[in-house]
Curated annotation (Swiss-Prot):
The gene is nma111. GO terms for cellular component: nucleus. Residues 1-47 are annotated as: Disordered. One of its GO terms (molecular function) is serine-type endopeptidase activity. GO terms for biological process: apoptotic process; proteolysis. It comes from the Eukaryota. It is found in: Nucleus. The active site is at H120 (charge relay system), D151 (charge relay system), S233 (charge relay system). SMART domains: PDZ (SM00228). It is an enzyme of class 3 (hydrolase). It comes from Aspergillus terreus (strain NIH 2624 / FGSC A1156). This is Pro-apoptotic serine protease nma111. The keyword Hydrolase applies.
Amino acid sequence: MDLNGDSNAKRKRSSISAAAERPAKHLRPENSSLTPGDTTPANGTVYDVEDDAESSHLIPIAAAPADSPEWQATIEEVVKSVVSIHFCQTCSFDTELSMSSQATGFVVDAERGYILTNRHVVCPGPFWGYVIFDNHEECDVRPVYRDPVHDFGILKFDPKAIRYLKLTELKLQPDAARVGSEIRVVGNDAGEKLSILSGVISRLDRNAPEYGEGYSDFNTNYIQAAAAASGGSSGSPVVNIDGHAIALQAGGRADGAATDYFLPLDRPLRALNCIRRGEPVTRGTIQTQWILKPFDECRRLGLTPEWEAKVRKAAPTETSMLVAEIILPEGPADGKLEEGDVLLQVNGELLTQFIRLDDILDSSVGKTVRLLVQRGGQNVELECEVGDLHAITPDRFVTVAGGTFHDLSYQQARLYAIATRGVYVCEAAGSFKLENTLSGWLIDSVDKRPTRNLEEFVEVMKSIPDRSRVVISYRHIRDLHTRGTSIVYIDRHWHPKMRLAVRNDETGLWDFSDLADPIPALPPVPRKANFIQLDGVSQPAAAEIVRSFVRVSCTMPLKLDGYPQAKKTGFGLVIDAEKGLVVVSRAIVPYDLCDINVTVADSIIVSAKVVFLHPLQNYTIVQYDPSLVQAPVQSARLSTEYIKQGQSTIFVGFNQNFRIVVAKTAVTDITTVSIPANASAPRYRAINLDAITVDTGLSGQCSNGVLVGEDGVVQALWLNYLGERTPSSHKDVEYHLGFATPALLPVASKVQAGEMPKLRILNMESYVVQMSQARIMGVSEEWIQRVTQANPSRHQLFMVRKVDCPPAGFSTTAHDSFQEGDIILTLDGQLITRVSELDIMYDKDVLEALIVRNGQEMKIQVPTVPTEDLETDRAVVFCGAVLQKPHHAVRQQISKLHSEVYVSARSRGSPAYQYGLSPTNFITAVNGVPTPNLDTFVQEVSKIPDNTYFRLRAVTFDNVPWVVTMKKNDHYFPMSEYIKDPAHPAGWKTVSHDKAKHKDGIAPDAANLNPDAMDEGFDDVSELEPEVRLEVGHWTVR
């Protein structure tokens, strides 16, 4: 904490948005109270999910006394000039992540249409927004100026667009701010339409508050008052009783104190006048931060009594002087000024205030100024050339391989006292997702070539072919002592364009241009390698199985199917070395819109593709090209016998360091489980499976591995299962359980034979009922006796817990389909007491089922569902929302599909985020035209002109219909599609509907989408690659 107590400062930007007004769904979490007889893994590995939403600390405010008639008259006039600003920063840039929010501004020029607000509202990066006036008229705005340092910016609107309100403006009167003055803060406090807060100015000479990481104002004094403003009041006018704006609301305290900080209006008034005259707003700098220090501190720094006397005589009301706090390396003052220098004169003029210092520097860009400072009691005269502050404030960025880059800004350099040079990663995504941090990296070199600035970085990236692996050297701005080195996989197929965005202050937009087309990938080359040998391991079977493990890394360019991550890594088991077939957890490879890389023997990296995704049992089969692998890879031998409870086995797994670990153990339990459904957004989960647990603590530390017998035969796979997200902590639960290999054989054998399995499944989820429950529910004693004979180890039957919503065009009647509560006795005459016996459904179109319903035995003909239609084969990205057909997990959790246009995810800072189109909603109509499927949806939204409002009729997951109005934005969020195409090298093709770039509006292309900036649930979280919190002890089930 500094002398002003800034450790608890916060900016006043609302965290309330339209997205918070209508939750997407209210599905009851299933991990709180389980249905009797249900069995769910009890101990799941939990990993953290960070929340990207800013907290809005609402402070209780005592009732204010009634205003005087004078104040009432003033407020009535002031509110006509105050506007509520709804805005987005469409992508991360400099100190800010992409986001949607609300704030306040006020009209300062009604004739020309200028609105004054905060710099952190105007945003350093691409801005898109609108304002709402007091009479609820709406108007688009565009930025015309954002100050490089001070917290103010100016927006422009078209005054002719306001037809029903007589526009008025607030006069800026910075010299009217005085200690003891009564003020009112009129603004959009806490996201409300209008709030009026009262206060009294207590200080005029406060240093600018430090907000920590990110943007902070400096080199200006702030005004302090007690007004208790909250989120959303950023940019509010601080008015006196005369109705003049005397300051600009900027920040406050987050610890409950009712202290607020206001920016003086001297520099905003000067900038506004320059813009009115059509002149550039010049800003000068010597790359030095000054702070106000009182005379007693200045004396300790070496201020002599003679100079103190001169200052006090020249400015009797002053109690402080300017002291150098930070001098940036390689700046104009580097080697001349020193930290702790007390500023006496500039160009021979005695100077104690920021305002006059800004005046001199802003009028001296490109010129030299003379400074006189005292350093330890000695006078030091020096000259500094004044630089252009705009020149060291980035106004362009480059997107390539999924990441976003620009030159290091003065803001960031000042915060960490480093030189204003280097390539800054403002959005670490795609190929440049480094160490799970969203931004803040400085790229020192790429492919062994230095990248000292953005131009050098672009030239290096132009020469790197697609799918190359290159070495990069980098540091994080928070820890410049530590240099990191990583090998990154350059993705120029999902992100083919290298785009340059340049700020255009005339239009308020950022103009995009393509810098270079991708260089095609080089042909892969066969490599040689050998596997490690386990030292000191007494089990030969464990030593042999090492040759059957490969590391599998999956990177997803788009969030689909509710999956929360963009990258996942684990281990797979080679089941056919000659054909390159590997079985891996579906929690690692959830769908086939992805890049899969297989690492063999920790040496050879080859790409792979998805061959088969099992709809129920949590495994994926992928295939790599074995001709590229010259290593003794061994096909794992899979057991045909089910492992039994109490049986001895050898656990072989991989820990969090990707190191193999071995333990002799025994099977503690085999229980039929279903992974709990995720409450916030449906996503793939395993159901109807027998889960194996073992008696070793390593099972909790290892997410992948096998259980292998003494003879080297694999008895079970050890897989990680993605579970539910806890509603209170927003953490995902991951279960580690064994899966018996005989259940894998029916599918694996077909894949090995070159046949694509076309499974059919029963569209239901079941759970176990014991005989005591079955008897009460009407199962006869005869059947109970048969069950005990058929399955001596587990006396159980299966009850239908949930019937899936059938796919489109699939119709059944109540008589020939399962119902919730049915107890299954036989399928096609076979008694069903084990999960594995349900596999009879794989090859049958219809099954004859003997069930007990409402206490009565009956036979029904139950149709099975083909699994080919369960996987996603198309996604439409529209206004930042990812739309797809409802995937299998949705059908498992819902009773009725309202349409085939399902919102799977949305991007921060997009229209979908701004207007509250949340994931898990169904879109049923566009402008009154029904859109039952993606084809009709694309057809209708293509008719909507850019920057035009349209209506979407939607239905929440809980069957609540509602209407959302949105404004289309083709400039920043053009519509694109991902369509599965087996003929395409990546398995999917991309199509762009950007009419500004393609004449007919359709061409092969892809937007530079960042899945890490998407949320797939309504809890608005930004996913990071998780770090697993390890559970010590046994895994148990209940």
